[in-house]
Amino acid sequence: MTQRTITLIAGPTVSGKSALALQMAQKKNALIINTDSMQVYDVLNILTARPTEADTAIVPHYLYGYVSPALHYSVGQWLCDVRKLLTTFTSKSLIFVGGTGLYFRALLEGLSEIPHISDAVRQKWRLRLDKEGAENLYRQLLRIDAVFAEKISSQDGQRIIRALEVYDVTGKKLSWWQKKKTPPLISPNCSEKILLIPPRQWLYERIHKRLDNMIERGALEEVFAMKKLMLSPFLPAMKAIGMPEFTAYFDGYKSFEDALEMAKTQTRRYAKRQMTWFRNQFDEEWTLISSCEEV
């Protein structure tokens, strides 16, 4: 009987990690599990570069495109869904692939059991961030939870308001909650870990080509479909690649050319942040490669 293997493949957007996962899954007779926070959402098939029907016909893919964009899907919910898959497929080899570093970390290290934060509280703090700015809220966070505040940048608005909303709801510091973790679903020693980071210029050229291709394939129709849902701009799905820029185009605030160029710029910046995070957070147990050919 072939021994079950678990493989983790992380990398920035457009790096080729999905193609690598497909290639390895065929060799290992494995299932592919989404480890990307945007690819869980329905509607956003093209904008989030979900696997094609041809890909899913070759290898079974799980946790893709099954969550309503109207929901605020969390890493905790993703872990619950992964746990169900691990229970269902007890002997099947698995490949986790994606670009969301926090998902990989939660998978290998466990997750703090922070109570649910309501959409109303989330929206309250996002409005305050827009009105007061990250610096002002960071000073408030320093008074409440200096331990966590000193770990992050004073410009990191999302993590600042995350800590503030947790304190708002629970009355306890985020640094306190982070000490209370669930056991990891996968032992770090029982998996093959691959970090795919291609040369930056190659990656940027791929980003430009992919966005042009997304437009040709109907990305604007997806944006329009999302607009018709009249969702809160604070929902994660509304921040998918191209959504803010092309929404501004439909609303008459940008020309199509400016929206496309801004989408390319923001995607390059996102890829750069991903690469920085992976390099800083992942240890030497991850095998660093620059192309699929190295596997």
UniProtKB/Swiss-Prot annotation:
Binding site for ATP: G11, P12, T13, V14, S15, G16, K17, S18
Catalytic reaction annotation: adenosine(37) in tRNA + dimethylallyl diphosphate = N(6)-dimethylallyladenosine(37) in tRNA + diphosphate
Residue positions binding substrate: T13, V14, S15, G16, K17, S18
Matching Pfam families: IPPT (PF01715)
Organism domain of life: Bacteria
Record-annotated site: Interaction with substrate tRNA: T100, R122
Subunit text: Monomer.
PANTHER family named among the record's database cross-references: TRNA DIMETHYLALLYLTRANSFERASE
Protein name: tRNA dimethylallyltransferase
Encoding gene, per UniProt annotation: miaA
